[in-house]
Amino acid sequence: ARGVVERFCQKYDFPLIVRDMAAEGLAIPDVKRKLKRPICSACGKIKRYFFNQTAKEGGFTVLATGHNLDDEVARLTSNTLRWDSAYLSDQGPMLDDSDGFAKKVKPFWRVTEFETANYAFLMGIENHYAPCPYSTGASFSTLKSLWLELEDKMPGRKMDFYHGFLERGKPAFQSAEQQEGDVLSPCTRC
């Protein structure tokens, strides 16, 4: 995947910032061995930390990620199955900046993985199609598969579910979190 990104940035003369997790003392294979379970959650937290740190150090006002509709629906389903009100209160295509945290946006939230892959193919953009080598047994893969099957039988259901959550569910969870939730703040050691 890294090679694909490097070639894309070189072709279009985009600057590329690479953070090597092993050099930071957090090599993902080592973290995986210590966890002895699917690493997705820990890997995501590690990446979010370094994305945010890089944005702040670089003076970037917004951090954009490539999360798409499939990612968002799988995450929403996972958070709903656990009734994780903290995550449900801030899930969405945009998260404002706050004390020590860069503003985050997900410009592809309306687009599926399939649509993105088709666009890349039609435009001649090299794409990396292989799943993460550590994702075996991860719940997100299972949830994405379930949503693909549901979408096949009920077209438009992914967007209906996610958009409905943004309009009705998220405000309810935000209200509940404001009343009883913890305030997100930067780590005092970091």
Which residues make up each language-model segment?
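ATP/NTP-dependent adenylation/nucleotidyl-transfer catalytic domains that generate, transfer
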Residues: 88-190
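ATP-dependent adenylation/nucleotidyltransferase module used to activate substrates
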Residues: 1-101, 110-123
